Amino acid sequence: MGGQESISNNNSDSFIMSSPNLDSQESSISPIDEKKGTDMQTKSLSSYSKGTLLSKQVQNLLEEANKYDPIYGSSLPRGFLRDRNTKGKDNGLVPLVEKVIPPIHKKTNNRNTRKKSSTTTKKDVKKPKAAKVKGKNGRTNHKHTPISKQEIDTAREKKPLKKGRANKKNDRDSPSSTFVDWNGPCLRLQYPLFDIEYLRSHEIYSGTPIQSISLRTNSPQPTSLTSDNDTSSVTTAKLQSILFSNYMEEYKVDFKRSTAIYNPMSEIGKLIEYSCLVFLPSPYAEQLKETILPDLNASFDNSDTKGFVNAINLYNKMIREIPRQRIIDHLETIDKIPRSFIHDFLHIVYTRSIHPQANKLKHYKAFSNYVYGELLPNFLSDVYQQCQLKKGDTFMDLGSGVGNCVVQAALECGCALSFGCEIMDDASDLTILQYEELKKRCKLYGMRLNNVEFSLKKSFVDNNRVAELIPQCDVILVNNFLFDEDLNKKVEKILQTAKVGCKIISLKSLRSLTYQINFYNVENIFNRLKVQRYDLKEDSVSWTHSGGEYYISTVMEDVDESLFSPAARGRRNRGTPVKYTR
């Protein structure tokens, strides 16, 4: 009966006697056992001092246990886990209706994203020729809807049409029929992205970047066009460089093949549209937008190889007729570009250097410190902006993989130095390939690439160059999602010399929830970290589609006050207010 004993006598009278306690020796006894009870009380009083000592020991043990409560000690990244149903308690039973008639899952229409994704399949390319009508839910429906002349006139009065496009009724002009999101976020240039002096002094391009025609579209293995069995039926097209008249890149144009790995037609479309959005002065950009882009998009949507190649040839002819000096003068004046331009440019480099040998990145032990994973460009752009990474800053990536984060920080933010350290041999080899291709492509597009440095096939632990640069870093990236406790301790030791104001990006909190200031860690830099948790959006990392969480820790001059509040320490990652109870 939970610490109590039930005793029955011959008279069927029942008595309840409490088990001996450290703090209480109360009991209920019968008159018959009065003498026996008196002896028990005397014995209890004689051991009172011993019981008091035991009580203090137990209390100390409980305090120590609470100090290392698992709630405060460690926590899984909650964002990557499935949320519980908070509406009602799950009894584990499946409703009969749901058991007999399973729920219907709606099919998503990915047709409008076929161009913006470089890994689209052929079945997503074609679309009906019917006019598009925007539904209330924001999706595009292909159906014919009669519109009266009065409705057209009213619409014109409410919203003026774009100049030169007033009388066009073709669905080609809609934003959903473009390769690039024309309404996407823009990137304010913090430094001169284009190297004007280089462009003015070099009219001939002498680099040899990897050609698109050497890549497979449905296999990560490299090959040449002549190695395919059906090369005779493949149509090819050459795309004119917008800055160097002597350079043209050859592409395979084949809408019948799978483009699961690489889509050359989509890449052509993006490059032509970026010519309009970034490189060309206004008069030429409008001409390209009105004359060539509609036919280019329509031929892609209809899988019209002949029309697509014809649009490319018209583009090439137009580019050759534009004075090169006009383009250079325009590039000198621009102060913002589409953010996707940097992402797509880096993807072109990635497909040439990393894709053909991507299988090498799978050579690692599962769930170890050496697991390979990538942070995707959109997330990097967001977090660089949050950290206010800017021109002249020093950026470091501890565990840089193939160097994606390093080169994006260099191009997007204009860092004075972008540094990466990688220990794995295969990833280090691919880093060199990607960096060499990046340098060639930057020259081809007239882009400035600031100082980039790698420490390859070396650990960042006991690394002299890392130790030398840590005090200079403004932003440090540590993808510690699968770091074990031992490596996290070494990272803590490495970061001790970080300067005030340095921001550290991580996928798990650098400072354990059990961390406390004591006599032995008074000088630890973790005492001065202001740790902020953020929600990670979907499609931010390569190993999962789901969202999650990430942290930005800022090195402060003074001690973080939350370390002195147990309540604040407990809710540091929960974001809940303090609740006081009796």
Curated annotation (Swiss-Prot):
Protein name per the record: Histone-lysine N-methyltransferase, H3 lysine-79 specific
A cellular component term, taken from the record's GO annotations: chromosome, telomeric region
UniProt source species: Saccharomyces cerevisiae (strain ATCC 204508 / S288c)
Modification sites for Phosphothreonine: T576
Class of enzymatic activity (EC top level): transferase
GO MF terms, alphabetically ordered: DNA binding; histone binding; histone H3K79 methyltransferase activity; histone H3K79 trimethyltransferase activity
Highest classification ranks of the organism: Eukaryota, Fungi, Dikarya, Ascomycota, Saccharomycotina
RNA-binding in keyword set: no
SUPFAM superfamilies referenced in this protein's UniProt entry, alphabetically: S-adenosyl-L-methionine-dependent methyltransferases
Chain spans, region Disordered: 1-50, 99-177
Membrane spanning residue stretches: none
Entry EC number(s): 2.1.1.360
Residue span, DOT1 domain: 254-568
The entry's keywords: Chromatin regulator, DNA-binding, Methyltransferase, Nucleus, Phosphoprotein, Repeat, S-adenosyl-L-methionine, Transcription, Transcription regulation, Transferase
Biased composition regions of type Polar residues, renumbered to the chain: 1-30, 39-50
Modulation of this protein's activity: Ubiquitination of histone H2B by the RAD6/UBC2-BRE1 complex to form H2BK123ub1 is required for efficient DOT1 methyltransferase activity on histone H3. Interaction with DNA is required for optimal histone methyltransferase activity.
UniProt-listed GO biological process terms: DNA damage checkpoint signaling; DNA repair; global genome nucleotide-excision repair; meiotic recombination checkpoint signaling; methylation; mitotic G1 DNA damage checkpoint signaling; mitotic intra-S DNA damage checkpoint signaling; negative regulation of heterochromatin formation
Effect of Y350F: Reduces methyltransferase activity
Residues making up the signal peptide according to the UniProt record: none
pH effects: Optimum pH is 8 to 9.
Residues with PTM Phosphoserine: S565
